[in-house]
Amino acid sequence: MAPSRLQLGLRAAYSGISSVAGFSIFLVWTVVYRQPGTAAMGGLAGVLALWVLVTHVMYMQDYWRTWLKGLRGFFFVGVLFSAVSIAAFCTFLVLAITRHQSLTDPTSYYLSSVWSFISFKWAFLLSLYAHRYRADFADISILSDF
């Protein structure tokens, strides 16, 4: 079932705000805290949120109808970055535990693992929406063939 315009607008707004937050995390943790792990995962979360925003905007503009292979590519990119984010989450969590880092330290690997999980969330949402929109347009294209 196709989402309403309100749902699409809310999804797009949430994606846009989250992409700005991810890029802000990238800048702050690169310049101020000099913690590349958190900066990288925050930047990845921002890029993935921006990609989800592009997915929603292209769905609203009806661009996907003629380019279903693009949605398939977005799905596989989401799956790839889901795996990368889970691996980064586990790695940062193990590093934080073995180095006995504080939970409240802004330069600890615990914060990097949190942003790895947020990156996983956006990668998962990219795959989910690409799959749903592709199924939605595949049904429409089957009906339009008759």
From Swiss-Prot:
GO terms for cellular component: endolysosome; endosome membrane; lysosomal membrane; phagolysosome membrane; plasma membrane. Keywords: Cytoplasmic vesicle, Endosome, Lysosome, Membrane, Transmembrane, Transmembrane helix, Transport. Changing residue 115 to C: Slightly decreases heme transport. The keyword Membrane applies. The keyword Transmembrane applies. It is a multi-pass membrane protein. Its main location: membrane. It catalyses: heme b(in) = heme b(out). Induction: Induced by iron via heme and non-iron metalloporphyrins in macrophages as well as by erythrophagocytosis (at protein level). Also induced by hemolysis. It is found in: Endosome membrane; Lysosome membrane; Cytoplasmic vesicle, Phagosome membrane. Highly expressed in the brain, kidney, heart and skeletal muscle. Moderately expressed in the liver, lung, placenta and small intestine. Strongly expressed in macrophages of the reticuloendothelial system. GO terms for biological process: erythrocyte differentiation; heme export; heme export from vacuole to cytoplasm; heme metabolic process; heme transport; localization of cell; lysosomal transport; phagocytosis. The chain crosses the membrane at residues 12-32, 40-60, 74-94, 110-130. InterPro entries: HRG (IPR026218). One of its GO terms (molecular function) is heme binding. Changing residue 82 to L: No effect on heme transport. A motif (Di-leucine motif) lies at residues 142-143. Belongs to the HRG family. Heme transporter that regulates intracellular heme availability through the endosomal or lysosomal compartment. In macrophages of the reticuloendothelial system, is the heme transporter for heme-iron recycling. Essential for macrophage iron homeostasis, transports heme from the phagolysosome to the cytoplasm during erythrophagocytosis (EP). This is Heme transporter HRG1.
